[in-house]
Amino acid sequence: MLTAITGINWGDEGKGRMVDLLSQDYDIVARYQGGDNAGHTVKNERGKFVLNLIPSGILRPDVVCVMGGGMVIDPEHLEKEIAALTEKGVEISPKNLKISDRATITMPFHVAQDGLEEERLSKTGAQFGSTKRGIAYSYGDKYMKKTLRMGDLVHMDASVRKRLETIVESKNLTMVNIYGQKPVSVDEMWAWCERYAKLFAPYICDVGQFLAEADDAGKKIMFEAQLGALRDIDFGIYPYTSSSNTVSAYAPIGAGIPGRKLALSIGIMKAYSSCVGEGPFTTELAMTEADKDALREHGHEYGAATGRPRRVGPFDAVASRYGVQCQGCDELALTLLDVLDYMEEVPVVTAYKLTDGTTTNRFPTGKTLDDAQPVVEMLPGWHCDISGVRKFEDLPAAARNYVTRLEELVGCKIKYISVGPERDACIVRD
């Protein structure tokens, strides 16, 4: 059985928290895209964990985690992430962590170029709000066939050295002539690769074969997405997107088994909206600065990977309905409902008003989205602590009505409702 856990919005919806909860019923959890540019935060009895590269299932001792070929992997960051997990008592070995030999390596020059380009663009206000982790440049070089893959670390021979020389020669045309930097050293990059070859070679394998055999044997496999539908390179708010496909249809492809079909798609969405980075974010126009500050503080809305304050706003039903459609959701998980406990009234964006005076509940693109204004519906708040509730019928009537109203607006059943950061702070509806 293949299940995808994906984000409905801009990312930061709480996917890691839900993967950690639901993975107790799965054998394998696989990441299929992205790099270390976003963090999945999980809290359990052992403390707080922020996972950037490793699937959230790693916190379950009986789960095997897979880093798929659709990912871009910075070995330096992966080493630190493994060390941080190990320090907290999480056991990691090639038995429970497998890295695709097809995954792209994020090299030091990718990270450097990302920072330099964002700095250059910021001088004219044209920056994208990059995390400066080298993600776009890793994917760009992947498609231009000018980088190495994790499988190359297993065979560090003369042919790999020759390819690296060609890659560095090409990269130096940019680093020296555009950014005025010192040339990248082939010897330094080779030594860097050798270091991580020794460290990660035992983890690197053909994960496609592993996943196919597991699926054939009836194992339950969960695909864990990074970011959300609105950050998808094709279906997101271009160019303010990530550089990979975050949608569920890509999950089997990026994980390593492109011929297999999903049995279940579970979308994760917040009870309100948040966003890191540049680009149109219509829902934030529906709140005063003071109200946004209050929501940000109650929700602790700061990027898990960057620490940057997130932009916030009411639940955006227009964007969420589009995200549900993009992800082909069978059911939804609504996270952070408890964050709204303090509100007397809870705003919801139900439509967008366009410059021609019309309103729409369809998510627009381009200039139409840039100029859209939110249409807001106010719902009664419940103004009490719901963090201890474990049954839907025990929620205050206003909270139940809020959940059912969101279901109506996005057109999909909400099965899971998280009411706190702890592993068991979740309501499961029949």
Residue ranges with predicted function:
Residues 1-430:
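Non-transmembrane, aqueous-exposed alpha-helical and coiled segments at domain scale
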